[in-house]
Amino acid sequence: EWWKALEEFKKQVNNLKIIALTATPPYDSTPAMWTRYMNMCGEIDEEITIPELVKEGSLCPHQDYVYFNYPTKEEEKEVRRFEERSKAMTEKIMRDTQFLTYVRSHKGFSGQLSDDLLLDNPAYLASLLIYLQSKNIAIPSRLQRLLGAKKLPDMNVQWMERLLQGFLYDDVDSYLCDKTYRELLIADLKSDGLIEKKKVVMTKSAAVEKMLTNSLGKCNSIRDIVFHEYEASGQDLRLLVLTDYIRKEYEKAIGNTEYDVNSLGVLPFFEMLRRDNEKKNEQIRFGVLCGTIVIIPAEAREALEQAIGMSGKVTFSRIGNLSETDYLKVTAVGNAHFLTGAVTDIFSKGYMQVLIGTKSLLGEGWDSPCINSLILASFVGSFMLSNQMRGRAIRVMKEHPEKTSNIWHLVCLRPWNEVLKADDNQISEDYSMLERRMEHFLGLHY
């Protein structure tokens, strides 16, 4: 890695004076990475805020927007099924007299555990007391005082999840419980998808959260944003969609309406937007720029060849079922590195209003100051990577000093009346990712 070479260079040169300017400090990285950063650059002496950089003209004025969507009907059904399984399991365990016997055997109820040990996990202690209360069993006053709660809430799925996590995994030794009973209960929970990697999941399942993060409702969000931005900016629009996957299997769907393109990825986005553009009879032209596939409008062929010049060779071919007079697939002969700059050049000249690519472009040091709108259709939650992506849209452009930029973040949420009832950590993993992403952006608070 490049940083190893830099560290080695630093070791071998004496009396170095280092001036370090970092656009994106690794604030939310691992401790090891932060230590490495500090060893190389030294303590931070001054932090220049984004508003200061905008004021002095180093960055263009910009605005972040969060575009929320609800799950699709099918996704909502899957969420409901998970909730129903959790509720049914809670009710089943509440009726289980054997479970009650085992819970009452907990060492904390017979004074065998110290206060400090019991308070290591107050939420778990609360779940034990709430369970006893729900079974109309007197709660030891010492434990309730220890918890500092005059009144305990009713038993629900959240408290059952905490109780089962301790009973089945984290606090096994505190119970006088038959091993076979515990194994059968684990098998029962697993069969309902309520255990993932030795973690009881009755409120937030990784499988359900992944489905919501990848919600197909985000396709509609992207469609809405693209046509809204085009309505506002017309042919001056230079919109970049950054996502995580190419989805090459959708190449055969391009120009073939028999195929459904509801999926999150470069090629599904391209075809979805192209079809909608055709239906609306709009004049938006789209492009794709990835390491393994490049698509340009057919009328941009000559401009691309001029931009490439003598730096490389390319071939042009049909893409999917589209006519060669509509869009072209561009393939480099040999090393394709030169193609990125050439496509960026024709994008900046207006041969395309919307460019779709993967975040791997950032690793190639890619830049295009013409971008005036960015859709982050990526599941990156870290500040560092998010800021690198945002940075592509907030560059100043000397040819257009009046440039401003919009940055769009996509989040899938349950209907708002359900969100209001949920704890912050139960809203959705997608929402939590947005919070992590926004943590260090000045002025953005969610």
How would you describe each model-predicted region?
Residues 19, 44-48, 65, 287, ...:
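Hydrophobic/aromatic beta-strand patches that form the interior of the parallel beta-sheet core
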Residues 10-16, 56-60, 231-234, 279-280, ...:
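Conserved catalytic network of the ASCE P-loop NTPase/AAA+ motor domain
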Residues 2-4, 29-31, 251-252, 298, ...:
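Short glycine-/acidic-enriched loop or helix-start segments at secondary-structure transitions
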Residues 94-354:
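Conserved C-terminal RecA-like helicase domain
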Residues 259, 275-281, 287-445:
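Conserved RecA-like P-loop NTPase helicase motor core
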Residues 21-25, 243-245, 357-360:
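A short beta-strand-to-loop transition that corresponds to the Sensor-1 phosphate-sensing loop
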Residues 2-62:
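Post-DEXD/H (motif II) to motif III coupling segment of the RecA-like Helicase ATP-binding lobe
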Residues 65-68, 75-107:
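Charged, amphipathic alpha-helical linkers/stalks
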